[in-house]
């Protein structure tokens, strides 16, 4: 056999090296994930985000072959968890269940260490839902138009409660306040359950409540839902009209939950995660659990999620500015 000339060796050797690197790279990509994945949660254990993500993570782990490890990092309206996620290595081993609060509302109210448009990769949309406008069954307001008429007649006797400043309920109330030029007072409480207790006790005339917080009372008949603030009717309250249907065309005030990672997740990581999460979101048991918690499914592609963040950042920015909403 003839010896390979030095010139030919110089050509072949680099080519072999490149092929070797490509093979190694391909092998590494095929192995993702090869260790547990951290799922950061910006609230305490047992909250809405935790309840939503656990069955999803459990089923997704069976598809991708690795477990999810829950890490709770509450504080600052869940912005701490998003900041941690933004600074994580974009290797697919740090994900985060976030929501519209720290993603599109808080950035309009305070200076944050992250940019919701530049620092994250949107992976999967989980679900969303509006708030319910609720009154006691003995209220003089029998429907949303009746409530507005009463509030206009004597604004000093009317106020609305919410779970706190800057929440979707508060901002929905400010939108309605502006549309009808009501001039009624916002009464923020420290959470959804305390707010429900106050409206039940007659201390506030009506409430913008999450469906989950008010569902038991609505079902029992101790609270009456006049309308929901999402664009579409809720699966939980199919007989309750939306504000859009009640004459406020285009009215849409809803919270949503999604799964994100740091900016720059590799294509091979997205190719594993996106189909896996999407498959789980079609599971009837997962859908039922999400509906029971007061949310509706919101199937979206990562590109559609990008567009939603842009749209909602602008929308809530306008509402916050017009209502002069100040951070707590």
Task: Annotate each predicted stretch with a short phrase.
Residues 2-15:
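Bacterial N-terminal signal peptides that target proteins for export
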Residues 24-27:
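N-terminal signal peptide c-region/cleavage motif recognized by signal peptidases
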Residues 30-119, 157, 165, 181-208, ...:
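N-terminal (or domain-start) structured segment
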Residues 34-36, 178, 182, 219, ...:
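An extracytoplasmic/periplasmic, membrane-proximal ligand-sensing/linker region
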Residues 51, 55, 59, 80, ...:
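Extracytoplasmic/secreted proteins, especially bacterial periplasmic and envelope-associated proteins
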Residues 87-93, 100, 108-194, 243, ...:
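Hinge/capping helix and adjacent helix->loop/strand transition within the periplasmic-binding protein
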Residues 128, 214-282, 311-314:
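C-terminal lobe and pocket-closing loops
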């Amino acid at each position: 056999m003839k010896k390979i000339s030095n010139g030919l060796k110089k050509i072949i050797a680099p080519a072999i090296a490149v092929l070797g690197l490509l093979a190694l790279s391909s092998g590494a990509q095929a192995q993702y994930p090869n260790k547990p994945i951290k799922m950061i949660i910006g609230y305490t254990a047992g909250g809405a985000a935790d309840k939503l993500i656990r069955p999803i993570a459990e089923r997704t782990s069976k598809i991708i072959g690795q477990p999810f490890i829950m890490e709770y990092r509450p504080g600052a309206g869940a912005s701490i968890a998003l900041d941690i996620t933004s600074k994580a290595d974009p290797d697919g081993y740090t994900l985060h269940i976030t929501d519209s609060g720290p993603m599109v509302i808080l950035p309009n109210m305070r200076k944050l260490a992250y940019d919701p448009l530049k620092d994250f990769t949107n992976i999967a949309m989980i679900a969303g839902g509006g708030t319910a406008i609720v009154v006691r069954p003995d209220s003089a307001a029998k429907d949303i138009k009746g409530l507005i008429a009463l509030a206009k007649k004597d604004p000093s006797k009317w106020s609305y409660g919410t779970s706190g400043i800057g929440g979707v309920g508060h901002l929905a109330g400010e939108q309605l306040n502006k549309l009808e030029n009501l001039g009624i007072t916002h009464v923020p409480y420290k959470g959804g359950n305390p707010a429900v207790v106050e409206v039940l006790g007659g201390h506030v005339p009506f409430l913008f409540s999450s469906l989950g917080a008010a569902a038991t009372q609505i079902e029992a008949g101790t609270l009456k839902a006049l309308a929901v603030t999402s664009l579409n009717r809720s699966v939980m309250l199919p007989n309750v009209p939306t504000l859009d249907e009640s004459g406020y065309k285009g009215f849409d005030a809803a919270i949503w939950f999604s799964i994100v990672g740091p900016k720059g997740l590799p294509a091979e990581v997205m190719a594993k995660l996106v189909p896996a999460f999407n498959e789980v979101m079609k599971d009837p048991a997962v859908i039922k659990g999400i509906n029971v918690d007061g949310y509706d499914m919101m199937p979206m592609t990562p590109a559609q999620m990008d567009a939603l963040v842009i749209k909602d950042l602008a929308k809530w920015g306008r509402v916050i500015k017009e209502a002069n909403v100040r951070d707590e």
